[in-house]
Amino acid sequence: MNLRVLPILIVTSCLGACTTLQGVLVPVSQGATGTQQVDMLVATTRQRTEPAEMFSGARGSALSYANIRVSIPPASARKVGEVQWPQRTPGNPATEFVTTKADVIDRPQALAWFRRAVRTTPKRRVLVFIHGFNNRFEDAVLRFAQIVHDADAPAVPVLFTWPSRGSVLAYGYDRESTTYSRNALESVLRDLSQDPAVSEISILAHSMGNSLALETLRQMAIRDGRVAPKIHNVLLAAPDVDVDLAREAITDMGPKERRPSFTLFVSQDDKALAFSKGIWGGGARLGAINPDAEPYRTDLAHSGVNVVDLTRLRAGDSLNHEKFAQSPEIVQLIGRRLAEGQTVTDSRVGLGDRIVQVTAGAAGAAGTAAGLVLSAPIAIVDPQTRSTIGGHVEAIGRGVADTVRPW
């Protein structure tokens, strides 16, 4: 185990535990002007507990559902990429994330809610989020609400939350809880994909949640002959997954043309994954690799996995483990791609140009000309991008010319 990283993780976990109130999901009775609402479906393998908490970190005996509506404070009261946690209960909707609805529902009610939501959503797309290690139920709910709001993607939000203890000392329990939840996640994905109104499904997994996502999709492919065709995009954010296991899981899903498009978000300065690497005896974690180094460069190219390297992007968290959600540029980039029904590295619409814009914004925030490194297939810098890249480079310094490069 990396003993230099462990104290950081323990302190971070303790700070979160000490500052998190009980009952933050209890709906408030009054709203505030200028707020926006995120209405989500929740599917969980957690055990039901008292109403103020809704679901605990224990494992439930069956799949449960909830419908939760989160109120997001006005833009003037918050920073994109951050969750404004209540300082006391009830929270203040003018400045903090609060719920206006939090109902436990049964499966027929969940499917009915989903059918209504899909049919009133433009282009009828769905976004499924799978959280990572050390997440309480309320952590997962409010973080997903932040992602959905800040990404501004017109998609039906579905949270799949598995039994995490919400403790840095429960790593083994959390890991086995992802295995425990595979069948349930597969059932949820099958239900969503079988709705005839759904056009496509994207999956966004974070940290340890990537293990659950990959193993579930692998299991689905083996059971059904392929991953459900409506599952188009899988976004792997800071995956706490062994590199070899990830490669085998994707391979087992079948040929590239019969499996989803995968986008991998990595950061070589991720301290949480450094901790995980120590626990697993030094095995490389997928979310912390150098995509330009062998054998990863060749393996990723062979698998057709797109890579976004966030190593030089400064994060809001001390562990550099949530850059995908805390960086305004990245979370909005994800939202635009999902809104347009394309992969995060689709070159046909000049995505390279948009990423240079993201780089410019990140560079300004970080005070460096190379605020963000992006590694992606060479096709990302398409003709449309090349025609406009010069202006962006001039805006942030010549050094940015090296930050968008072929992988």
Where would I find each of the regions flagged by the language model?
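Bacterial N-terminal signal peptides that target proteins for export
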Residues: 1-7
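Lipolytic serine-hydrolase domain surface
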Residues: 23-103, 112-113, 118-121, 141-157, ...
